[in-house]
Amino acid sequence: MMSACLGFRELGLQPYEPVLEAMRRFTEQRSPDSQDEIWLVEHPAVFTQGQAGKAEHLLVPGDIPVVQTDRGGQVTYHGPGQLVAYLLLDVRRLGFGVRELVSRIELALIDLLASYAVQASAKPDAPGVYVDGAKIASLGLRIRNGRSFHGLALNVDMDLAPFRRINPCGYAGLAMTQLRDLAGPIELDEVRTRLRGQLVKHLDYAEQTTLTGGID
């Protein structure tokens, strides 16, 4: 059964930690009737450690800050030109288990990439989306009281060099790739629009809307 309307907030370039705190507040304060939201954002350069993160996977962070988070997974990198989507969903209301939610997000990303003639796939033992073994999108979620927060990060048109300062997602030597290198020059706004459509489709929402106002 399709859910009603999925709301999107397009936040532009935002520091990581204030968005993290806003996600937590939204999740703690929402009611059973709250509209599900997805926040689309870019972050200045930052490494984030998941709950399973190990210090040895931070090789040489250097001048890039490291933030400990409460999402699943290990260490990853965020930076300008990477499209991040935070999925603030009532998973219980949607009727999805965690594994199904992850699979639906991966399929949305795979179909998005296919629209650029990029053939991608998921791995059963390593959440995310890959192209010829190189990772193009990372996933890390947290479920609290049946509601999800955190989300996905898609490499679109960014500097990939900082990934070499870590073992991405805890895998030594994991190659990273991005859409620009596979499909040529890319407009981030267009990718954002296509991602919205794919998430609405794969998460079984009837429609979408753009939400205005801040996240404070």
Curated annotation (Swiss-Prot):
Residues the entry annotates as binding substrate: 71-78, 138-140, 151-153
Active site (UniProt): 169 (acyl-thioester intermediate)
Catalytic activity: octanoyl-[ACP] + L-lysyl-[protein] = N(6)-octanoyl-L-lysyl-[protein] + holo-[ACP] + H(+)
Subcellular location: Cytoplasm
Site positions (Lowers pKa of active site Cys): 135
One Gene Ontology biological process: protein modification process
Keywords: Acyltransferase, Cytoplasm, Transferase
Annotated metabolic or biological route of this protein: Protein modification; protein lipoylation via endogenous pathway; protein N(6)-(lipoyl)lysine from octanoyl-[acyl-carrier-protein]: step 1/2
Keyword Transit peptide: no
Described purpose of this protein according to its UniProt entry: Catalyzes the transfer of endogenously produced octanoic acid from octanoyl-acyl-carrier-protein onto the lipoyl domains of lipoate-dependent enzymes. Lipoyl-ACP can also act as a substrate although octanoyl-ACP is likely to be the physiological substrate.
Entry's family note: Belongs to the LipB family.
Name used for this protein in its record: Octanoyltransferase
